[in-house]
């Protein structure tokens, strides 16, 4: 049975596509083509960027200097020149002429030519300025100064060999020896010695003990280390002169610091900047005598005299005289005694004390030799005599009064 639809209107079925048939342009060549195009475009882009960078970093005048740059040509073209050959003229015919004598040569006086400007001589290079060293800046020292320095050094060595430094032990033995010659002197111990900070208290304490002994009262001050109590009382009763040796150093400013410095120098076995001073308290003559072989090592003599005068007024109240006589003050040294020596101060103090014991109104310091070596030679004789005399004395013991 036939269908009601027309057969001609029917569409023919599409046959299935065969995948095995080749395609005109495959996918792989197409990708390769795209890669080549991309590479070419990238290369062109890089060239453009490079040229742009060159234009940025170089001006136009710099670009013209490159060999590959075209040179500019003038706008007007040169007109070509047409050369027309011109025939050379023939030489003229030679016509003989009568010979004429040459004109006479008239010599004219030569005018002096203007002098050429002289060229200045070439300037010579300036010599470099000499560089002054530190030695050139120092003033020249005359030869005589070196001679005097050498003589001074030799003089000092000679003096140091003549008079050695005296310590507290030798000074105490010397005081014991003086007591045998002058019983009115009390050999005060020098260990520890008095200082600039406590010598006044020490003198007042001894005078207070002397008054107590004269009244028959017990003494209140400290007893000496190397003397018995009874022997010390007998010394106080008979004494009329107190030799107070002071140890001084310029560095410490208090008593405790002075004692510490003294201890340190004793351990080192060095005198350093230490110095011996002497204060004589003459009870019978009511006199304070101050001796400094360096004259003003502690303080100016005027200041020391004022200080001792104030102390003398204090002694008038502590130990008054029966006739109301006041203590006077005397500064013995008028100049530097130990010139050329730094360690003979102890020996000079003992020498002055010996002169004072022989004559309280002595002017022996005014009769000293001017030459420092001769002066210390005389002192060396005194030192040798004292050292020989103290050899028979007991070690660190007070003589019996």
Swiss-Prot record:
Provide ranges: composition bias, Polar residues: 1-11
The main location class comes to secreted
Q: Where are the transmembrane segments?
A: 40-60
Report biased composition (Pro residues) as residue ranges: 86-128
Q: Where in the cell is it found?
A: Secreted; Host cell; Membrane
Superkingdom, according to UniProt? Bacteria
Keyword vocabulary terms for this entry: Hydrolase, Membrane, Protease, Secreted, Thiol protease, Transmembrane, Transmembrane helix, Ubl conjugation pathway, Virulence
Catalytic center at which residues? 275, 292, 345
Q: How does it sit in the membrane?
A: Single-pass membrane protein
For the region Disordered, what residue ranges are annotated? 1-24, 77-130
What are the protein's GO molecular function terms? cysteine-type deubiquitinase activity; deNEDDylase activity
Q: Which GO terms describe its cellular component?
A: extracellular region; host cell; membrane
The induction comment states:
Expressed late in the infectious cycle.
Protein's GO biological process: protein deneddylation; protein deubiquitination; proteolysis
Q: Which InterPro entries match?
A: Papain-like_cys_pep_sf, Peptidase_C48_C
Oligomeric and partner information? Binds to host NFKBIA.
> What does the UniProt function comment say about this protein?
Effector proteins function to alter host cell physiology and promote bacterial survival in host tissues. This protease possesses deubiquitinating and deneddylating activities. Impairs ubiquitination and degradation of NF-kappa-B inhibitor alpha (NFKBIA), thereby preventing NF-kappa-B activation.
Q: Which family does it belong to?
A: Belongs to the peptidase C48 family.
What name appears for this protein in its UniProt entry?
Deubiquitinase and deneddylase Dub1
Q: Which organism is it from?
A: Chlamydia trachomatis serovar L2 (strain ATCC VR-902B / DSM 19102 / 434/Bu)
Gene encoding this polypeptide?
cdu1
